[in-house]
């Protein structure tokens, strides 16, 4: 009977040890440790910190210098940060590392036990560095928050990213978009130049400046065969961008983004309305003084009917009429003390100045033209010529100036009506040539600058921006890359 109990006990102990080995192996796999011979000898939890003790079984070592057998000089425990399983806890690996010494008294060579998952003298596993780098893809994450997440210093997180990540320029596609983004890092980096692949939306590159002394050596360094393959260059109405076609892309045609053309006339109308607001505010101020009022720093002059309507409802003039939701039901206006609907506000604006209706109607003609001829540049050319003739003879100086603008950029505007096929999440679709995608990309650059509360290192900003906004960034992990040489030249 006793023999049976001993056998059963031995079986239970053996089964328990087998389970523990399997359990330890699963934990090491879960921790993603590269050294398969490592075992977990202990686990403890102290507050919000988990401690896992790792060690290897002793094995025979021979001196790499003389070939004599080496003896262990004992164990040294290293604290290693390994940011896996961070479910509200900090995870610390207690790594028991042996030190070996050659038994030959004439040699005395010593070495420390090495591990593949952590480098010598490092307090973080190799996986930590890769996870830190991956965290920089989130534009909403600051370097400080990333460092806090992985229990490292801000400096370590930034140095790790800069050490491993070097982003090269992407190849040019046959449709390229260019635009500037305001960074204002220093006297050399005020407006950076964003270059984008129109098909994929990925940023091709980010240049420190849009000035000639930056762009000229940069584009000249790109092989001519690659630049000759560009068919369309999309930009706003900034003349140096349009001149890129003749200087750098000999086979391309310039495309002026339709959004910027519409923004030009909207800005002019808005400035006209603001001038009206200033006029009525000045009138109200003079009436207040003439009626015995005293002007000081505490004086508040209530907004007149004209100022109120022009300030709060000028969007009825500026917004595309097709996108305005007109409501017929009357609602009490607390400032005017009357029941009003959208049509009433519109009529009230036109009664203040009938020119506002003329401006709105002339603006709507261009909005409708811009929306109706996508994919049909030939008919767009005919309609644009008719619009130019209408604006030139309308008697309104704002639209006469607009007609001059349309004449100056006539062919570039027509090119924006070309449609091309793009691949999206839902499959293939037709898209009009526009700078819309690059405007969205610029907002990400501005958000990154704001989140970092200002940047002073352009190379780090460039690398972070490209790494975070490309779909599948390829890390060029080399110490240096070939920078662009900038020359002291003024813009043309």
Region spans (language model):
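Short, positively charged, Gly/Tyr-enriched micro-motifs
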Residues: 2-13, 81-187, 227-228
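RNase H-like nuclease fold core
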Residues: 3, 9, 159-232, 237-244
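Short, conserved DNA-binding cores of transcription-related domains
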Residues: 2-110, 114-115
């Amino acid at each position: 009977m006793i023999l049976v109990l001993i056998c059963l006990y031995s079986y239970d102990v053996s089964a328990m040890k087998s389970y523990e080995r399997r359990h330890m192996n699963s934990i090491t796999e879960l921790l993603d440790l590269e050294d398969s011979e490592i075992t977990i000898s202990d686990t403890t939890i102290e507050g919000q910190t988990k401690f896992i003790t790792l060690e290897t079984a002793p094995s025979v070592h021979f001196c790499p210098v003389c070939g004599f057998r080496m003896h262990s000089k004992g164990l040294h425990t290293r604290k290693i940060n390994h940011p896996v399983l961070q479910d509200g806890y900090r995870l610390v690996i207690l790594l028991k590392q042996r030190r070996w010494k050659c038994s030959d008294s004439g040699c005395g060579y010593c070495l420390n036990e090495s591990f593949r998952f952590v480098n010598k003298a490092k307090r973080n596993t190799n996986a930590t560095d890769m996870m830190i780098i991956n965290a920089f893809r989130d534009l909403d994450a600051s370097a400080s928050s990333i460092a806090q997440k992985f229990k490292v210093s801000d400096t370590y997180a930034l140095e790790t990213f800069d050490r491993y990540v070097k982003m090269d320029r992407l190849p040019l596609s046959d449709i390229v978009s260019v635009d500037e983004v305001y960074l204002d890092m220093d006297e050399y980096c005020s407006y950076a130049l964003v270059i984008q692949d129109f098909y994929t939306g990925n940023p091709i590159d980010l240049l420190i400046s849009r000035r000639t002394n930056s762009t000229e050596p940069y584009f000249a360094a790109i092989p001519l065969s690659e630049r000759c393959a560009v068919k369309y260059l999309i930009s706003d109405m900034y003349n140096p961008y349009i001149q890129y076609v003749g200087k750098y892309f000999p086979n391309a045609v310039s495309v002026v983004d339709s959004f910027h053309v519409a923004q030009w006339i909207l800005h002019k109308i808005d400035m006209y309305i603001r001038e009206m607001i200033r006029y009525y505010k000045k009138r109200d101020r003079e009436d207040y003084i003439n009626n015995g009022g005293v002007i000081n720093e505490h004086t508040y002059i209530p907004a007149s009917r004209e100022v109120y309507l022009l300030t709060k409802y000028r969007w009825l003039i500026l917004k595309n009429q097709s996108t305005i939701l007109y409501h017929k039901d009357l609602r009490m206006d607390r400032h005017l003390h009357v029941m009003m609907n959208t049509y009433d506000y519109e009529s009230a604006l036109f009664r203040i100045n009938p020119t506002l209706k003329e401006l709105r109607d002339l603006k709507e003609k261009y909005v409708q033209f811009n929306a109706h001829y996508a994919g049909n540049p030939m008919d767009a050319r005919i309609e644009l010529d008719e619009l130019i003739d209408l604006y030139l003879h309308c008697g309104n100086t704002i639209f006469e100036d607009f007609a001059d603008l349309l004449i100056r950029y006539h062919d570039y505007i027509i090119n924006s009506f070309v449609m091309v096929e793009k691949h999206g999440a839902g499959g293939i679709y037709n898209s009009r040539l526009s700078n819309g995608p690059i405007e969205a990309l610029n907002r990400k650059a501005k958000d990154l600058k704001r989140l970092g509360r200002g940047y002073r290192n352009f190379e780090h900003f460039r690398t972070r921006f490209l790494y975070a906004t490309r779909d599948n960034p390829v890390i060029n992990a080399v110490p240096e890359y070939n920078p662009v040489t900038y020359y002291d030249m003024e813009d043309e």
